[in-house]
């Protein structure tokens, strides 16, 4: 079981997002979907529910409501958390990296 989420460095999280996530995701309201869905408003949203993006059945049926902890659990190993996800990213194994990234995402994805 992944470690509990603890707020981290927003600045380091922004760098992680830029180097690990930005090639597939956008965060701004009304931003386009890329390989992955736009993440604006992801927190408090149910998995697989952004209109205009084609999710796998696995993501839709996982029925998770995203919060900091569920996002941390997912980002540690996406294919283990949701077998059948099409997210190619292998995950962030370091707890600190996940905490930093999620701290950034909580602000950037509002």
Swiss-Prot record:
Record keyword Cytoplasm present: no
Alphabetized PROSITE patterns for the sequence: CYTC
Top-level taxonomic group: Eukaryota
UniProt binding sites for heme c: 21, 24-25, 87
N6,N6,N6-trimethyllysine carried by residues: 79
Post-translational modifications: Binds 1 heme c group covalently per subunit.
Any single Gene Ontology cellular-component annotation: mitochondrial intermembrane space
Biological process terms in GO annotation: mitochondrial electron transport, cytochrome c to oxygen; mitochondrial electron transport, ubiquinol to cytochrome c
Keywords in alphabetical order: Electron transport, Heme, Iron, Metal-binding, Methylation, Mitochondrion, Respiratory chain, Transport
Transmembrane segments: none
Localisation: Mitochondrion intermembrane space
GO molecular function: electron transfer activity; heme binding; metal ion binding
A Pfam family per the record: Cytochrom_C
Family per similarity comment: Belongs to the cytochrome c family.
Function text: Electron carrier protein. The oxidized form of the cytochrome c heme group can accept an electron from the heme group of the cytochrome c1 subunit of cytochrome reductase. Cytochrome c then transfers this electron to the cytochrome oxidase complex, the final protein carrier in the mitochondrial electron-transport chain.
Record-given protein name: Cytochrome c
Organism of provenance: Eremothecium gossypii (strain ATCC 10895 / CBS 109.51 / FGSC 9923 / NRRL Y-1056)
Gene name as annotated: CYC1
């Amino acid at each position: 079981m992944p470690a509990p989420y603890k707020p981290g460095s927003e600045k380091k999280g922004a760098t992680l997002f830029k180097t690990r996530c930005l090639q597939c995701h956008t965060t701004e309201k009304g931003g386009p979907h890329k390989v992955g869905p736009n993440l604006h408003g992801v927190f408090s949203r149910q998995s697989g529910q952004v209109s205009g993006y084609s999710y796998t059945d696995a993501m839709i049926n996982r029925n998770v409501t995203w919060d900091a902890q569920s996002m941390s659990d997912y980002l540690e190993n996406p294919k283990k958390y949701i077998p059948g996800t099409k997210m190619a990213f292998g995950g962030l194994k370091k707890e600190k990296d996940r905490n930093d990234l999620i701290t950034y995402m909580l602000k950037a994805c509002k």
